[in-house]
Amino acid sequence: MHLTLAHVGARPGSKDEVDALTQVYLERCSPFARCRSEAFRTEDALMEWLQKQQGRMPAVAVLLDSRGRTMTSEIFAAWLGMRRDEGAQHIVFAIGPASGWSQTARDRAQLLLSLGPMTLAHALARLVVAEQLYRAFTILTGHPYHAGH
């Protein structure tokens, strides 16, 4: 399974400490899935990239959206496990532009996912998603990382 953590509105090459920690969590996921991070300048660029993925490795599009579904870590792990067991080859978790997702993008998504009612900076949202992906895999494999939640 391939996982991509995508975000819109990025300046090419801009990195900070939060990005470094996000990368740590994505690397921790490597025993379970191939993970990478992708930055896109615009929503249109991301949507075009997603469309191109359909020919190679069909992607499940999960858009992070304040109006989306909230999940506990356990429910998120179960959702991810179901996608894996159904044979999903590629899941893209995308953090949108500051103005929010267009209706076209929302309609294209298989899941709108909310991290909660608070607004997060894009870098922090990426970190939270990366950590929750790692946590989900540890829940699915019975690893003690989540045991003391």
PLM-predicted stretches and their roles:
Residues 1, 33, 58-59, 108-110:
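Short glycine-/polar-rich loops that comprise or flank the Walker A/P-loop
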Residues 1-29:
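N-terminal beta1-alpha1 ligand-phosphate binding loop
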Residues 11, 66-69, 97-101:
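Short glycine-rich anion-binding loops that position phosphate/pyrophosphate groups of nucleotides
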Residues 15, 72-74, 102-105, 124:
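Short glycine-/acidic-enriched loop or helix-start segments at secondary-structure transitions
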Residues 5, 62, 96, 129:
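Conserved RecA-like P-loop NTPase ATPase core
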Residues 104-149:
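Structured adenosyl-cofactor binding patch, chiefly the S-adenosyl-L-methionine
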Residues 29-92:
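S-adenosyl-L-methionine/SAH cofactor-binding core of RNA-modifying enzymes
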Residues 18-22, 75-79, 107-110, 127-128:
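Short, glycine/charged-enriched secondary-structure capping and boundary segments
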